[in-house]
């Protein structure tokens, strides 16, 4: 048997790849290039030899800091390009590699240029917005001034009091300079202040002015025609132009302070109509000049950003690679001469030749006089777990890894989950109409695979795309199980001709309840469509699906136990085979394996025996005659033997192994044997990284702890055999729920609406049926069946053999950054 097993071909996914711990001694002059080439290869996971040092104490901390600063500048350029509405269009030609120092200088120059252009543009934009506000104030305030001019004193009162609240506004406006330096002002005459304020502040602003002047003011306001950009916040807001008439220097001071507090911008407006028109022309002229200047600045800035955008993608990749290289170099140690860097890491055994060739090429390309020393080390801790997967198996491997990463070289459940997972899903989801809908969705994802793989997807879409092959297999198995159940959106199809049953005579009026006879062989595949609508439909389908669920569950749990045997055999643990695998197989199959056998015999013979009665009285009255419940000769003695075996298996699981471990431990430390004790149950307090091959410690053997752990493990298996078998009945329950929901939506929505002659009611019925099918049956039910299949694999199947305390192989690879 062992020779036969040894001759079987190796499976890539059955066990993780064999790993090797290697040491690298790299000369300083070729260190950077060597790490770069290893990152391109992506098959070496470095160990951090400076874990006790902070990031700032490491050798290449300054280089990492420089890379971080360059990353910040590149993010700044990316944000500026996005804000400008430009696209990063990388050059088609291959750019030569650029040194880190040269790239750093280029980025600094570009950043300085862009920041300077942004600053100038911001100042010009602020001036433009202020002039725009000034223009609006001139247009709106002139009406108030004309109406008030007839009541004003003959002496012209210019608005030198109307101080402009924004510092240094319009320093060169010739007419404005004249207006700000009037001849003389009557200190007791009527004055005014004009400006503009946000509309949402207007009521509070007016109330504050009224209280500050004790009502001795006249407030006029009008809304601007459109939203304008606020000069201080650069936000589009709705503003209101106001003119405040007052008297006295003290009132002027109070009003200006209130304007400043509320963020109102005050602008000087002359009373004379001619001067207003002249000032308006000057403002419009300056606005036109500023628009031309802003457009030219925007074009110049966009040209500069476009020149950056051509190389931005390559620069981002270069900086990321350089930072990853220096982060990896920080994990290496200098030797005593400070001329070489020493590193350690894990690599797959098959990759040693490739790594050696890469290091030789790095030595040659860097013109180093000394080559890189590459040699294998003796591993103490457990290696990382690495599986070589493809697009199809990767999704199933991720499902398993979500529960726990496999211990180094233990049996991998993902191999079997590729088939069992979609099949158990389909048992719960079996409807070939719904399966076709899932298939169309999976085919759409596969057809757009190349395009979607290069796009940035949302979290939900990314999850769907990553599981596209899982969805494909679930759809195919759902179609298969739906054909077995003979359900197409809950409707049975006569795929293989008519039913095997027909009416006894021509007077048979109800072919679903009475008068049916079987006139030919059973339906060749799937459920006979005549069961649909009959009085015995639910009892028949429930019996079929319940028994099928038990058979599938016992088969999968037995597969899990068989894998535990292969694990124990691979790790050389004969104790686990003799005192764990054998009694567990006996216990499970003496009870539930026997139940599965009875189900198959009953199906084959057509017996009317009550299996509930058989199993219950197998425990309560094992010696009583079975009577009409006897399925085969010798059933009662066989049941007694199986019951005794089940009772014997429990202490077999519990007692021998702890005592055998204590005996081996005592012999080992008495000098009679020096072999390393290898067992999955020896060192209960050992961390996962020392689970295999790390046995040079001399800890005190704690027999009580070993015994308690074995007791818990035995009780858990005994109780779990019952609960896990019952858990597989969810296959029956969810299949029944899915079928009944489909029937309700079909009969109570679609057929009911179709019974009306009104076309509107029919359309509503079709819409409701389509909505219920899509969102309840194809989304909620799919998710429910998916999660239940997940539970059956994680707990019922993997719990029989899977440790899941390993850690992933994470190589240094540029493809992963």
From Swiss-Prot:
Cytoplasmic side: 1-422, 490-547, 602-639, 780-817
Record field: transmembrane: 423-443, 469-489, 548-568, 581-601, 640-660, 759-779
Disruption phenotype: Lethal.
UniProt-annotated location(s): Vacuole membrane; Golgi apparatus, trans-Golgi network membrane
Membrane topology label: Multi-pass membrane protein
Single biological process term from Gene Ontology: proton-transporting V-type ATPase complex assembly
Gene Ontology molecular function: proton-transporting ATPase activity, rotational mechanism
Keyword Heme: no
Vacuolar side: 444-468, 569-580, 661-758
Sections of the chain in a coiled coil: 97-133
Family matches, as Pfam families: V_ATPase_I
Subunit record text: V-ATPase is a heteromultimeric enzyme composed of a peripheral catalytic V1 complex (components A to H) attached to an integral membrane V0 proton pore complex (components: a, c, c'', d and e).
Job description of the protein: Essential component of the vacuolar proton pump (V-ATPase), a multimeric enzyme that catalyzes the translocation of protons across the membranes. Required for assembly and activity of the V-ATPase. Required during cell expansion.
Name of the protein: V-type proton ATPase subunit a1
Organism from which the protein derives: Arabidopsis thaliana
């Amino acid at each position: 048997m062992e020779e036969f097993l040894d001759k079987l071909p190796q499976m890539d996914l059955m066990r993780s790849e064999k790993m090797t711990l290697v040491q690298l001694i790299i000369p300083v002059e070729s260190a950077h290039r060597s790490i770069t080439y290893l990152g391109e290869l992506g098959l070496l996971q470095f160990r951090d030899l400076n874990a006790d040092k902070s990031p700032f104490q490491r050798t290449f901390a300054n280089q990492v800091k420089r890379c971080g600063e360059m990353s910040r500048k590149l993010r700044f350029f990316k944000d500026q390009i996005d804000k400008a509405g430009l696209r990063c269009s990388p050059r088609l030609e291959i750019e030569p590699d650029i040194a880190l120092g040269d790239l750093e200088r280029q980025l600094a120059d570009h950043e300085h240029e862009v920041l300077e252009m942004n600053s100038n543009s911001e100042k010009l934009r602020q001036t433009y917005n202020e002039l725009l506000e000034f223009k609006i104030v001139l247009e709106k305030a002139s009406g108030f001034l004309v109406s008030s001019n007839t009541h004003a004193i003959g002496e012209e009162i210019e608005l030198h009091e109307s101080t402009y609240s924004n510092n240094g506004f319009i320093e060169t406006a010739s007419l404005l300079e004249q207006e700000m330096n009037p001849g003389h002002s009557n200190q007791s005459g009527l004055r005014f202040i004009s400006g503009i304020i946000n509309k949402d502040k207007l009521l509070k602003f007016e109330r504050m002015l009224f209280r500050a002047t004790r009502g001795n003011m006249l407030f006029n306001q009008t809304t601007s025609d459109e939203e304008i950009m606020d000069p201080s916040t650069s936000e589009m807001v709705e503003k209101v132009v106001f003119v405040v008439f007052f008297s006295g220097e003290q009132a002027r001071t109070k009003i200006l302070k209130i304007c400043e507090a509320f963020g109102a911008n005050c602008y000087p407006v002359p009373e004379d109509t001619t001067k207003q028109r002249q000032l308006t022309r000057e403002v419009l002229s300056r606005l036109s000049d500023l628009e031309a200047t802003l457009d030219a600045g925007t074009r110049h800035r966009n040209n500069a950003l476009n020149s950056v955008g051509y190389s931005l993608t390559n620069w981002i990749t270069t900086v990321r690679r350089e930072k990853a290289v220096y982060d990896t170099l920080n994990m290496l140690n200098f030797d005593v001469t400070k001329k070489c860097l020493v590193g350690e890491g894990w690599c797959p055994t098959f990759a040693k030749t490739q790594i050696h060739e890469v290091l030789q090429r790095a030595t040659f390309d860097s013109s180093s006089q000394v080559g890189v020393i590459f040699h294998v080390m003796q591993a103490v801790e457990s290696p990382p777990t690495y599986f070589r997967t493809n697009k199809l198996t990767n999704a199933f491997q991720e499902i398993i890894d979500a529960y726990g990463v496999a211990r180094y070289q233990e049996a991998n459940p993902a191999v079997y989950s590729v088939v069992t997972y979609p099949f158990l899903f389909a048992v719960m989801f079996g409807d070939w109409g719904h399966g076709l809908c899932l298939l169309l969705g999976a085919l759409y994802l596969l057809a757009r695979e190349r395009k979607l793989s290069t796009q940035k997807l949302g979290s939900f879409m990314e999850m769907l795309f990553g599981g596209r092959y899982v969805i494909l297999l679930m759809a195919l198995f759902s179609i298969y199980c739906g054909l077995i159940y003979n359900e197409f959106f809950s409707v049975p199809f006569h795929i293989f001709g008519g039913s095997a049953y027909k009416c006894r005579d021509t007077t048979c009026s109800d072919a679903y309840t009475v008068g049916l006879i079987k006139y030919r062989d059973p339906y060749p595949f799937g459920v006979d469509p005549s069961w649909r609508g009959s009085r015995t439909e639910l009892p028949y389908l429930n019996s079929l699906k319940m028994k099928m669920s038990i058979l599938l569950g016992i088969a999968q749990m037995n597969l899990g136990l068989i894998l535990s045997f292969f694990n124990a055999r691979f790790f050389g643990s004969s104790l686990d085979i003799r005192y764990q695998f054998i009694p567990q197989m006996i216990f499970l199959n003496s009870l539930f394996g026997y139940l599965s056998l009875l189900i198959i015999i009953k199906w084959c013979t057509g017996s009317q025996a009550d299996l509930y009665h058989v199993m219950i009285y197998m425990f309560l009255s094992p010696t009583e005659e079975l009577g009409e419940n006897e399925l085969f000769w010798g059933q009662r003695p066989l049941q007694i033997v199986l019951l005794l075996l089940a009772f014997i298996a429990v202490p077999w699981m519990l007692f021998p192994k702890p005592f055998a471990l204590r005996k081996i431990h005592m012999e080992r430390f008495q000098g009679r044997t020096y072999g390393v004790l290898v067992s999955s149950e020896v060192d209960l307090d050992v961390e996962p990284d020392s689970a295999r091959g790390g046995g040079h410690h001399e800890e005190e053997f704690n027999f009580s702890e070993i015994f308690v752990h074995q007791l818990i493990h035995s009780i858990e298996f005994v109780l779990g055999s019952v609960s896990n078998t019952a858990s597989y009945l969810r296959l029956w329950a969810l299949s029944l729920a899915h079928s009944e929901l489909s029937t309700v939506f079909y009969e109570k929505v679609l057929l009911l609406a179709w019974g009306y002659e009104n076309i509107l009611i029919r359309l509503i019925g079709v819409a409701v049926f389509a909505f219920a099918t899509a969102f309840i049956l194809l989304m909620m039910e799919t998710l429910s069946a998916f999660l239940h299949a997940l539970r059956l694999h994680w707990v019922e199947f993997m719990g029989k053999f899977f440790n899941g305390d390993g850690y992933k192989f994470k190589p240094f690879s540029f493809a992963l950054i």
